[in-house]
């Protein structure tokens, strides 16, 4: 069932190949994707897929936006051999990402998710794109409507280059000055303010037609270890977690936002395994 839902979202969101500077309607407009015809088409696609193809749809492959034959071969293999469900481009040139997006979509039998890690817009990864302040600065804005409009503008720019999912916003509460990886990526150290900014920005993204992904659940703000390199441990009781780390994520869930990224974090109070591989932490927290 979960695979069916994921593929349904993928097929409905990525309904066409998008090219630079195209003006497209919002891809997540309410009532547009949830139709009987669309569901029937998704069911038909699923019925024709092998188990390998269904598994491949659950993976997003990271590629560099480089116009090299080796890179194109990498993309070709990911799509044709492994049947991946989407791509995540790393840092590089805007024009290269657009060209490779169109190339990749032309290869895919099932339209691809094109994802992006743009916490403060395209300039976080792509050269020569509009620059916005980091989240720490945006967290000082008192009018949350501005965060909403900011999210819509980021969504507009994402759609112009064919991106349907942005791995943003950061929902971590930065309460540890020795944190080596979050700091200015966070909206600040006040859980309520962080939650308000997260919801406003993410709603702007989604109303603009781009799926938001709040991160890094259950909270990476009070760590002294970078989870890309090692396993941070959060030895806090449930009351502390509920009041700080988990608070913005719970508000995002209440707001009905579309996505959440699980961090590689060990939180003994929530489960014996790291959150990234703990169904209990993900499902029951």
Protein language model features and the residues they cover:
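Bacterial Sec-dependent N-terminal signal peptides
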Residues: 1-26
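Glycine-rich anion/phosphate-binding loops
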Residues: 93-97, 140-153, 192-195, 239-242
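Active-site mouth loops of central-metabolism enzymes
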Residues: 61-69, 136-146, 230-242
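A charged helix-plus-loop insertion that forms the helical arch/lid used to bind
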Residues: 131-142, 186-188
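Short glycine-enriched loops at secondary-structure junctions
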Residues: 64-67, 116-124, 164-174, 214-220
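Second-shell residues forming the walls of enzyme active-site clefts
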Residues: 50, 87, 97-106, 110-112, ...
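N-terminal hydrophobic targeting/anchoring segments and the immediately downstream early-domain regions
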Residues: 20-131
């Amino acid at each position: 069932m979960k695979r069916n839902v994921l593929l349904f979202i993928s097929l409905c969101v990525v309904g066409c190949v998008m090219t630079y500077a195209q003006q497209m309607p919002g891809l997540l407009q309410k009532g547009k994707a949830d139709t009987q015809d669309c569901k029937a088409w998704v069911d038909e696609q699923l019925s024709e897929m092998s188990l390998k193809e269904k598994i491949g749809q659950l993976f997003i492959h990271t590629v560099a936006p480089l116009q090299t034959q080796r890179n194109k071969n990498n993309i070709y293999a990911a799509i044709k051999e492994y049947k991946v469900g989407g791509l995540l481009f790393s840092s590089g040139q805007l024009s290269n990402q657009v060209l490779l997006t169109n190339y990749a979509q032309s290869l895919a039998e099932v339209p691809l998710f094109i994802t992006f890690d743009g916490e403060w817009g395209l300039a976080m990864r792509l050269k020569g794109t509009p620059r916005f302040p980091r989240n720490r600065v945006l967290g000082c804005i008192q009018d949350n409507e501005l965060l909403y409009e900011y999210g819509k503008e980021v969504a507009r720019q994402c759609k112009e280059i064919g991106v349907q999912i942005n791995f943003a916003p950061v929902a971590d509460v930065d309460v540890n000055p020795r944190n080596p990886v979050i700091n200015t990526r966070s909206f600040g150290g006040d859980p309520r303010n962080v939650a308000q900014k997260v919801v406003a920005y993410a709603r702007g993204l989604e109303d603009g037609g781009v799926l938001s992904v709040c991160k890094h659940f259950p909270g990476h703000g009070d760590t002294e270890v970078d989870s890309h390199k090692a396993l941070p441990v959060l030895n806090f009781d449930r009351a502390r977690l509920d009041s700080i780390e988990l608070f913005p994520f719970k508000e995002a869930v209440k707001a009905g936002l579309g996505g959440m990224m699980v961090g590689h974090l060990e939180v003994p109070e929530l489960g014996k395994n790291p959150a990234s591989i703990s169904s209990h932490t993900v499902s029951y927290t």
